Curated annotation (Swiss-Prot):
Belongs to the carbohydrate kinase PfkB family. It holds the Pfam family PfkB. Signal peptide: none annotated. Gene3D superfamilies: 3.40.1190.20. InterPro entries: Carboh/pur_kinase_PfkB_CS, PfkB_dom, Ribokinase-like. One of its GO terms (molecular function) is kinase activity. The keyword Kinase applies. The keyword Oxidoreductase does not apply. PROSITE patterns: PFKB_KINASES_2. This is Uncharacterized sugar kinase AF_0356. Its EC number is 2.7.1.-.
Length: 250
């Protein structure tokens, strides 16, 4: 949704249940200009999340994945999805099975450009379980805790290992310290945008949207980092993961 607001043609691959939550989710995507052509409708509950925010804007999330964990590879229209320039992956909870994770391990082989944000659910699964996805990743977008958990090393050393695995760009989110990016032998640190923190929900995804916007527009990695920090800063100025997402980077 963050990329769609910035004018990038986007589509969502996922699964929703036959309930009101699923209907609301699809309506939200369509209202924001995100194609739902690849959304699978199924019997059962849609995934939901309860988000708790403290007085400092920090948050905790309780997730019920519902049918989200049950996306079989054969349910995805991969041929039609290939028209998009990039596919972005993030973590499933894997509480109700490994179908969705296993589908991700297959679909990464079908695209030339893959971006991947592991989230804590995948970081906790360990490097062995994530290796196939990582070896097919173009842009890796972890935060510091996630990459250090995956590789059991500091983030700079871990990023070097990522490059050795064939990943083109590693962009590590450092929270209030901004971000650190590595591409080949080049390393840059990009300072954060000063802002008033209201709610950190969605900050990582907002950064991803800004960074990938820059990448898709052919920007230098440092400018991609600035765009990521900018979109994340706008996001955390308001409550919720979407309310603050900008419609322009100007």
């Amino acid at each position: 949704m963050g990329l769609s607001r910035l004018g990038i043609e986007t589509a969502y691959i996922g699964k929703v249940g036959s309930d009101e939550e699923g209907r609301i989710l699809l309506a939200d995507f369509e209202r924001e200009g995100v194609s739902t052509d690849f959304v699978i409708r199924a019997e059962g509950r849609s995934g939901t999340a309860m988000i708790f925010v403290d007085e400092k804007g920090n948050r905790a999330i309780l997730v019920d994945p519902g049918v989200n964990d049950t996306i079989a590879y054969d349910e995805i229209d991969v041929d039609s999805a290939r028209k998009y320039d990039l596919i972005h992956l993030t973590s499933f909870i894997c509480k109700n099975g490994l179908d969705s994770l296993n589908s991700q391990k297959r679909i990464v082989e079908e695209f030339d450009s893959v971006s991947f944000d592991p989230g804590m659910p995948y970081a906790e699964r360990g490097l062995g379980d994530m290796e196939k996805i990582l070896k097919n990743t173009t842009i890796f977008l972890p935060n510091r805790q996630e990459i250090e958990m995956l590789f059991s090393e500091d983030y700079r050393t871990a990023a070097e290992r990522c490059i050795e695995m064939g990943i083109e760009i590693v962009a590590v989110k450092l929270g209030s310290e901004g971000c650190w990016i590595k591409k080949g032998d080049r390393e840059v640190t990009v300072k954060p945008v000063s802002t008033k923190v209201v709610d950190t929900t969605g900050a990582g995804d907002a950064f991803n949207a800004g960074f990938l916007y820059g990448y898709l527009k052919g920007k230098d990695i440092e400018e991609c980092g600035r765009l990521g920090n900018f979109v994340a800063a706008k996001c955390i100025e308001k409550y919720g993961a979407r309310e603050g997402l900008p419609r322009s980077v100007d």
